[in-house]
Amino acid sequence: MEQTFSVTTAQRLDTFLATLLNLSRVKVAKLIVDGLVSVNGKKITKNGWLVQPEDRVHVNWSEELFEKVPVEVQPYDFPLDILYEDEQIMVVNKPNGLISHPTSFNESESLLGAALFHCNHQPVFLVHRLDRDTSGVIMLAKNQSSLLHLQKQLQQRVMKRYYLALVHFPLDSLSGTISAPLERVGNNKVMWKVGNSSNKAKNAFTKFTVLNQNEKAALIKCELLTGRTHQIRVHLQFIKHPVYNDPLYGLKSEQATEYGQYLHAQQISFIHPTLNKEMGFEAQLDKTFSDKLDNLNLKIANSLYALFQ
């Protein structure tokens, strides 16, 4: 089915199509990434492309494109940045753009698949997940016993996870805790929002500390006290400091690039499931994130690295 629409107000391409086609952002993203959308005759593959008044948007799609397939982890020959590995666990620095787990929309190239390939098809399990465009430390277990041990640490907040987030605008408070329950946005299977105390909303808590800021932006450290989907991104949007380049929760006026949100899982600490000793690991920023900080004149002062210890 081919359709053409005229734009009346400036907005993101994915938002524009999601509204007109009554599709989720995930489905719209698939249309765009698969090259089925053009603007003024030019094929566009960036979800965050900003369309302007009088632009003509053409899309060629059908519901059959979104038929789900059974999710099965396929070995994926992909080089992993392994921070630590033994017979029980793996700690990996996940790159931006790689999904943690395969999806039901024929997306099989995942970090879990890469770990499966690395382990010669021996069982391996995700202890937690990171969003596709969130880079940084992620943990995997090599057996059910270690998996349960580590997931229990998550639930009891023994495991500590620290993130770096680049956000818009300077913050008035240099530290604090965001306490705001999260729930889905209507029937949308992708987006979340701050809800109320209804049964649908789940309690969520995020601690933050400003590491550096100027008149345009701030680099902040976030600690997850709970682990809800998109928690940091939604919480920072809620306090009106959205993450830079966030395709779902960023500024509407911002034309997001393929890199996605500037959010990085910087550090993790936990008790090893069999050695019974505390361990901690840090993942370095990639060049794109680091260059962005340079462009905005934002760096972490050496004295502030202690905040991650």
UniProtKB/Swiss-Prot annotation:
So where's the catalytic machinery, residue-wise?
A: D131
Keyword Isomerase present in the record's keywords: the answer is: yes
Q: If you read the UniProt record, what top EC class would you report for this enzyme, in one word?
A: isomerase
* Record's keyword terms, sorted: Isomerase, RNA-binding
Which InterPro entries does the protein's record reference?
PsdUridine_synth_cat_dom_sf (IPR020103), PsdUridine_synth_RluA-like_CS (IPR006224), PsdUridine_synth_RluC/D (IPR006225), PsdUridine_synth_RsuA/RluA (IPR006145), RluA_PseudoU_synthase (IPR050188), S4_RNA-bd (IPR002942), S4_RNA-bd_sf (IPR036986)
UniProt xrefs under Pfam families: PseudoU_synth_2, S4
Q: What is its EC number?
A: 5.4.99.-
Tell me, which GO biological process terms does this entry list? enzyme-directed rRNA pseudouridine synthesis
Q: Which SUPFAM superfamilies match?
A: Alpha-L RNA-binding motif, Pseudouridine synthase
What are the boundaries of the signal sequence? none
| Reaction(s) this enzyme catalyzes, per UniProt | a uridine in RNA = a pseudouridine in RNA
Domain of life assignment? Bacteria
Q: Name one GO molecular function term.
A: rRNA pseudouridine synthase activity
Annotated S4 RNA-binding domain ranges read: 11-87
Q: Which residues form a coiled coil?
A: none
Q: Which family does it belong to?
A: Belongs to the pseudouridine synthase RluA family.
Q: What is this protein called?
A: Uncharacterized RNA pseudouridine synthase MG209 homolog
Q: Which organism is it from?
A: Mycoplasma pneumoniae (strain ATCC 29342 / M129 / Subtype 1)
